[in-house]
Amino acid sequence: MQTQSTCYKGTQKMAIKGVLWHSTGANNPNIKRYVQPSEIRPKEDSYTRDKWLQVLGKNKYNNDWNHIEHKAGVNAWVGKLADGSIASVQTMPWDFSPWGCGSGKNGSCNDGWIQIEICEDSLKDKNYFSKIYKEACELTAYICKTFNIEPKGFVVHNGVRVPTIICHQDSYQLGFGSNHKDTYHWFSSYGKDMTDVRNDVAKIIKETDIKKLYRVRKSVNNAKSQIGAFTSLANAKTACKKAGNDYKVFDWNCTVVYSNKK
């Protein structure tokens, strides 16, 4: 969690209506450029600062978003970790209102939409795009399941009918955001738009509803603490061991099948 940021300190809670995607607009796919751990660790975070720096990589320029000087903030990021793998990192609680899309004539989607920022590369690497697209869809599917969001649905926001899953450019077109092109300027090169995102997220939800998954979280009812859902018990145990003593592995019947506590 980027607890040192102005957004984290100054925002307020929101009623969650949907998910909004951004992309960074800069050629740097590394999450460490934007995300660094706080000096003071939240109690619920089992990772130390040094451990997070090992995972993320250190931003030697100190120009990440976890500072009071930066006047923006989102709920999660998707990009490369220090080892080159693709992952999602949550930086604010899901119900914290982000400062991400600005505002328009009808208001702002900062009020109601969990916002994800995807780290851009040169926009020419199809393999990277495929991986981050998949990761962002899976994260969005998780959010939709957690908060009962219909991925292909709509909500009425300030009198306007708005899709539950949108991007920054969508928010502008609907009168709820500033005029940024993301994510269409990138996605269109690979034949994707937000309709595809909604369909792919819905497909993931349908598939995971069918699959028998092992979920790693603190308690069966604490969905916000979940760090992953796995088809393999061995992989779930590995993730649980890394997460800390408070975490357990639950099967599809909500039964504890592994716990770090002896």
Predicted region positions:
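Short, flexible beta-strand-to-coil junctions
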Residues: 23-28, 81-82, 217-221, 250-255
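Basic/polar, cationic surfaces and motifs that engage anionic cell-wall
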Residues: 9-13, 122-210
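Short acidic, glycine/serine/threonine-rich helix-capping segments at coil-helix boundaries
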Residues: 156-164, 225-231, 250-251
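Local beta-strand/beta-hairpin segments that build beta-sheet-rich folds
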Residues: 91, 225-227, 257-258
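Short aromatic-glycine-(Arg/Gly/Cys) micro-motifs in beta-strand/loop hairpins
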Residues: 210-225, 248
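Short, mixed-charge low-complexity intrinsically disordered segments
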Residues: 245-262
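A short, charged, amphipathic alpha-helix used as a generic interaction element across diverse proteins
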Residues: 231-247
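Active-site-adjacent loop/helix surface patches within enzyme catalytic domains
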Residues: 1-152, 156
